[in-house]
Amino acid sequence: MEELSEIPDDGITIFSAHGISEKVENEAKNRNLKFFDATCPLVSKVHKEVIRFADAGKDIIMIGHKNHPEVEGTLGRFPENSSGQMYLVENILQAEILKVNQPENLCLVTQTTLSVSDTEEIVLKLKEKFPMLQEPKSEDICYATQNRQDAVKQLALESDLILVVGSENSSNSTRLKELAENCGVKSFLVDDPEKISSINLEGVKIMGITAGASAPEELVQQMVSKCSTLGYKVNQEISGLKEEVFFKLPAELR
């Protein structure tokens, strides 16, 4: 569901890892909805930074994709009574023409699912324009996003074609597809195993498969099974960086 108004009064609500705005949270509380906040701790950390910067009267630039759930939630954490302003920058062109009220009192946050390489050029341009800009901490970036992108670059060295399991409206899945193509490898975004049959696989001897952050493991395995029916064998699983970061479940679910 996209709106709280769609949820009945006796419904149980789970807020996604993308996070929510203060307005949405207050609406849920005012309706006495039973809800579980599954916001990613990295996103919550950025929310707290936005509130802290705003309380200090600073201007804030956020690098991210307009209308992305995480971005909407983070922008919605900026207090209306702050003396500062918050600005969204999506690309380097917007960075070049951006004007702020307090160039000497300016902070930067980013959408957590954008890797360092995704934002590098924009950050450089902003630092060039605003030398006093306070940069975000590297630990604010989703480690899983960076690891997946690094793994795709490695996978591209060994594959004739790469399937990215994920939906077209997933920004991190789309980015994986773009990275594979930038490495000179044909890449397709698929969210249904049956769609693989419509892809031209002529000359494709080695097929690589990766997945966006929100793609369930079950769907990935269905893709692998479908490829097996097309004559492809699972030869190896590339071992990327071992992730050893674990987050606790919300207290209500423990």
Each model region followed by its residue ranges:
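The feature marks the mature, well-folded catalytic cores of soluble enzymes
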Residues: 1-211, 217-254
